[in-house]
Amino acid sequence: MTTVEMGIPTVRRSVSLAGRPDVDHLVDRFGRVARDLRVSITEKCSLRCTYCMPEEGLPAIPAQNLLTASEIVRLVDIAVHRLGVREVRFTGGEPLMRVDLEQMIAGCAERVPGVPLAMTTNAVGLEHRADGLARAGLTRVNVSLDSVDREHFARLTRRDRLPSVMAGIRAAARAGLAPMKINAVLMPETLSGAADLLEWCLREGVTLRFIEEMPLDADHEWARENMVTADRLLAVLGERFTLTEHGREDPSAPAEEWLVDGGPATVGIIASVTRSFCSDCDRTRLTAEGTVRSCLFSDQEIDLRSALRSGADDEELAQLWRGAMWNKWAGHGINADGFAPPQRSMGAIGG
């Protein structure tokens, strides 16, 4: 058992499968099945959002510790064909920081045809790569965007890059990377502009989802008494729009949806803290260093990279992955007494 850098939790090379049923898919002890794979491919980012990264950025992961494009393609292949994963999303950091992203997408598209390949991005620089990514096989993008006011955006991200983001969003739409969703983190600093952001999304024809801020900030300054809840947001949006509760599009979807002014447009709210959906979670996460993380808030990761580079075959890697998910917690525990946030920030884990 070894410990690695950046405050990463204990990394194990084996796990207990005691009591696990003899099935191929990624089932856990609470009956949940992981079908949605999030693959973080870098810790680097072109922005410095206050809730995600410190101003100086995250410590660089040594190049030899990062999964290569071919290694990621192989693990995605295993996840789909041996473990039952049905959707793959590439995250960061910022995925566009990888110069081999198109190669990675193309390799996955060839190995797992028909499986949706999505990406969460800040869209900085996307205008130059949207067409190539679409040709490689990328299906759609979610864009992280907390404000459409340039000055406010610069304060939140510590970078004046809103024009590039807007150009990237338009380029993605032209390239057919749809349906596109905008993700915005709920904070006191973003609440006043929430209605303006929704207005902009309605005009642009993209779906907006607000996400309650979780204790995953790099500076570890999150405090429950300062967080903006889903109920508070609904009250603010209700001053400008008529919102009608619409529920979830499927039980495992994290966002509760509301019709806006009678529909068909909707706005989603992911109330990760106040309305936890852990009991329906269907996600499994692969970090940029090649470890499986069963939950954003897990204190352990299972090392696939070492096994992969030591000659493990596909079934051996799949079995390690199954063990990681079998031991997934019942929930994130944010509301429990004695909760301790993970040392990894969201930027280091991958969204």
Curated annotation (Swiss-Prot):
Keywords: 4Fe-4S, GTP-binding, Iron, Iron-sulfur, Lyase, Metal-binding, Molybdenum cofactor biosynthesis, Nucleotide-binding, S-adenosyl-L-methionine. [4Fe-4S] cluster 2 binds at C278, C281, C295. Pathway: Cofactor biosynthesis; molybdopterin biosynthesis. The keyword Glycosyltransferase does not apply. Belongs to the radical SAM superfamily. MoaA family. PANTHER family: MOLYBDENUM COFACTOR BIOSYNTHESIS PROTEIN 1 (PTHR22960:SF0), MOLYBDOPTERIN COFACTOR SYNTHESIS PROTEIN A (PTHR22960). HAMAP family: MoaA_B (MF_01225_B). This is GTP 3',8-cyclase. It comes from Rhodococcus opacus (strain B4).
